[in-house]
C-alpha cells in the first residue's frame, strides 16, 4: 500500500477476454494486500511532508485543490464488494449438492410418466406422484436451509458502520465540518476525544492524544499519539493515526496520507472480502457421497437397461426400468435428515454458548486439527488483575482466581498497609453506582485497566477504597502523562501522630526508582543503598519476565513547618518535593488466563489438536500467558530457554531441539513460506507475538499448507481476513467487532476458549452420528431396489411399489434416522486424533459394503420371504411366479391361473399384489428395528452403550405405529394402495431382524477382540 501502489490499482479492471487474466490479477492483488503495511510518511520531516502533499501546515489545502484531488482519487469510502444476490443464495440451496440428485430423480420420474402416458391407455400415476414428492422434498429442505443461513453474510456492512460521518478539516485557513467521504489526501484534519479518525493521518501536532487501536492491532491499552517518529514500523510509530480507530482523549492535528481503500483499514476490508472461503469439509464429504450413490445408481440402471433389452423387453419398458432403478437408489429422506441433524447440533451448541451461523461449520469444528487463538479476552480474562506485589524485600503472590480461591499473603504488614494506601489514593478509578450486591471482581469500573485492577485488589484486601479516599481527602493531583510516566497526588492525613500532608506517587519503575532516596522495610524507613537498589532492580526484572506490567509506588510525609494547614500547592509551577521520596513497593498486573483455559488446552492436546497463540502483545508477555494457559506446557523449552540454561548464544542451539517456539512478528516478516512451514512442522507449541493482521492470515495459510483444518479465533477488525480464510472462523460475541462476527462461521457468546473445546466435541460427535444415520438410511435401499431388479430378471409380479418406497424413505425411516443425532458418544471422542479428511470419509467403501452388501441383503431376504409367504397362501407358489409378470400386469386378461388352477381377475390379482407391497413395506420396518439398534454403535456392544436415547426409543414406536396406520387405516387402499395385513404376516421378518442383531454384535465383538484385524479393516466404517 506504499507509494508504489498507484491509484489505478484499485479501479475495477476492464472485463478481459480471458477469465484467467482476471484470476491472475486477483491473485496479484491479494498478494499485494498480504504484504506488510509499507509507508514512509511517518519518517518525513514537516518540511518534506509539505513538499510531498503541497499542504500549507497552518492553512491546509485550498478548496479548489481539494476538489481536484477528490475528482482524481474518488470519495474517501470503502468500495463495497460484489455481494451475492439473495435469489442466487436461494438457488444454491435448491440446486446444490444433494438437491441436484433429487432433482434429476424428479425429472426422470416426470419423463417416465410422460412416456407411459404417451404409450399406455390408462397409465399408472406412481411416477407422477414420485416426481411431485421428490420436488416437494427438495423445495422444503432448500427453504429450511436457506432460512438457517440467511441470518449470516455481508462482511462489508459492518465496515460501513465504521466510516465516520463528519470530519473537521482546515481549508483556506478556515475550519470547516465536511462529510467524511469528501476528505482528500493532503487535507489538514483536526480530531478530538470521542471522534473517529476519518482517514490515515500523519500527526503534526497533538495534545494528550490517545487512540484506541484495539480493533486494528489487538492492543487493549489506548495508544499515545504525538508528532514524534518512534518506530520504523508504521503500525507501531506514534505519529500515524489510522482510519476508523477512535480518538479516546486529547486533541490532534494531522495531514491525510491515505483515504478509502488505500487506508490500512481499507486494505483489511478488501482482504477480507476478497478471500475465498473454500468448501467446508462436510460439504466435500456430501459431494463425495453423492458421487458414490450416483455411481452405484447409474451402474445398476445401465446394467439392467442392457439386461432388459437382452431379455427382449421393448426399449420403452427398458427406459422405464432404468429410471425406476436410478430413482430407487436415491435416498429421498437423507437430505432432510442431514439438515435436521446439523440444526439440532447447532441448537445444542447454542445452549453451550457457541452460536453457529453456517450449519456445515458444526462438523468442521469437529475435524479441526489446529486452533490459532487470539490472546486477549479469549485465553485471558478480558481485564487486568493484580498478580504479584513486592514489599519487605520479597515477592508475594496475589490471588488472581475468578472466585478468590488461591493463595494469600500477610496482610498485617505495616509496609503492605502503606503500599495499599498509595494504590488506593493515587488512583482515579471508581466503581460504577448500584453494584453493592455484586462480587467485587464482577463490578464494572470507570477507569483504565491497570487502575481498575488496583482498585479491585485493594477493595478485596483492605475494605472500602471510597471510605479510605474520604478519610484522606485529595488536595491536588498531577495526572499521568507519557513524558513524566508517573501520577502524583497530595492528601490530607487524618492520623494526628504524623505530618498533615501525605504525598503519594505511582508510575513506571525506572522513573520511580530515580526519585527515591529511602525505602520502607517492615514499616521502618531505611536509606536506599546499592544492595537494596540491586534487589529492587532484580525484582522488577523478574516480574517483567513473567510478562507482567509492573508499577512502582512511593510516598512522602510533607513536613508541617514547610507545608502548614491551608498551604496552596501549585501543580503547574511545582512547589513541593518530587525527588528523595520513600520507596514502598511494586505491584504487577497481568491479564490472567480464564479459569477453564488450561484444562481446555489440555483437552485439545489430548484430542491431537495443536493450539497456536497469535497475539499483538510483547513476546515476554505472550510467552508468560502461553505458559499460564498451558499452550507452552511444563518442561518444554524455547530456543532462548535452552541457550540460557546452557549459557551459550542462541544461534548455537539447534532449533529442532526446542519443542516450544516464540516467533516475533518482525522475524515473521522476513521469513519465506518454507521457513514458516518448518516452524509449524517441527515445533509442537508455538506462540506468535507482535503480529499484524496480514501475518495472522499468512499463519493460517501456512497451517493449511500442512494439510491442517484450521479454526481461528478473533475479535478485532484486524482478524476478519484470517477468520474468513480459516476452515472455521470463531468470533467473540461480547467484545468482538461487527466485522469479525460477519466474517466468522461461529460466535462464542461468552468469549471463552473453553467453549471452542465443547464445540470440537459436538462436531466430532455429529460426524460419528451422521455416519450412523447414513448407514441406517442406506441399508433400506437394498430391500427397496432388489424387488425391482428381480421383477425385471425373473419376470415376477412387482413385490414392492414406488409409493411404498416413499412411505419408507420419507415416513417410517425419518424419525429413527434423526434420533441417531441424539446418540451419546461411544467412547471418549476427545482422546482420539482429528480425522484425516483425505482418508476418513463420512461415507466410505466399508460403510457401503456393510449397508448394501451385508445388512441390506439380510433385510431384502426378509422382505422376499414375506412376499412369497403371502402369494403362496393365496395359491401362487414361488416356482409358478417365474415369467408370470406379462399376463399378471395385463388388464385385459381376467383368467390367470394360480398353482391350484383357480382363475384370478385383473382386479383380484392387483389387490393381492398391493397387499404384498404393504407386507414387504412392513417387513422392511421390522428389519429396520434391528438396523436402528445396531447403528447406535460402531465398535461397542449395544449392551455397553445401553438404550438411554429416549428419542431413538420413540423412533422405534413411531415407525411401527406409522406402518400400522398405513396398513389398517380405512381408505388407504384407494389413497396409497395399501391393504390390511393378517397379524401373522408381521412376524415373517422377525427371524431376519434377530439375525441382523446377532450378526452385528458378533462382528463388533471380533473388532474389539482383534483391533486392526481383517474384520475391522473390512467392516469398521
From Swiss-Prot:
Residue(s) carrying Phosphotyrosine: 10, 258, 540
Quaternary state and interactors: The sodium/potassium-transporting ATPase is composed of a catalytic alpha subunit, an auxiliary non-catalytic beta subunit and an additional regulatory subunit. Interacts with regulatory subunit FXYD1. Interacts with regulatory subunit FXYD3. Interacts with SIK1. Interacts with SLC35G1 and STIM1. Interacts with CLN3; this interaction regulates the sodium/potassium-transporting ATPase complex localization at the plasma membrane.
Gene Ontology biological-process annotations: intracellular potassium ion homeostasis; intracellular sodium ion homeostasis; potassium ion import across plasma membrane; proton transmembrane transport; regulation of sodium ion transport; sodium ion export across plasma membrane
Keyword match Magnesium: yes
Reported function: This is the catalytic component of the active enzyme, which catalyzes the hydrolysis of ATP coupled with the exchange of sodium and potassium ions across the plasma membrane. This action creates the electrochemical gradient of sodium and potassium ions, providing the energy for active transport of various nutrients. Could also be part of an osmosensory signaling pathway that senses body-fluid sodium levels and controls salt intake behavior as well as voluntary water intake to regulate sodium homeostasis.
Active-site annotation: 374
Region (Disordered): 1-36, 214-233
Ranges per topology, Extracellular: 107-129, 307-318, 791-800, 865-916, 969-983
Bilayer topology term: Multi-pass membrane protein
Reactions that this protein is recorded to catalyse: K(+)(out) + Na(+)(in) + ATP + H2O = K(+)(in) + Na(+)(out) + ADP + phosphate + H(+)
Ranges where the record places region Mediates interaction with SCN7A: 594-715
Phosphoserine: residues carrying this PTM: 16, 38, 45, 226, 450, 482, 666, 673, 941
UniProt keywords, alphabetically: Acetylation, ATP-binding, Cell membrane, Cell projection, Ion transport, Magnesium, Membrane, Metal-binding, Nucleotide-binding, Phosphoprotein, Potassium, Potassium transport, Sodium, Sodium transport, Sodium/potassium transport, Translocase, Transmembrane, Transmembrane helix, Transport
Lineage per the UniProt record: Eukaryota, Metazoa, Chordata, Craniata, Vertebrata
Keyword Acetylation included in the entry's annotation: yes
UniProt modification remark: Phosphorylation on Tyr-10 modulates pumping activity. Phosphorylation of Ser-941 by PKA modulates the response of ATP1A1 to PKC. Dephosphorylation by protein phosphatase 2A (PP2A) following increases in intracellular sodium, leading to increase catalytic activity.
Family affiliation: Belongs to the cation transport ATPase (P-type) (TC 3.A.3) family. Type IIC subfamily.
Designated name of the protein: Sodium/potassium-transporting ATPase subunit alpha-1
MF (Gene Ontology): ATP binding; ATP hydrolysis activity; metal ion binding; P-type sodium:potassium-exchanging transporter activity
UniProt binding sites for Mg(2+): 715, 719
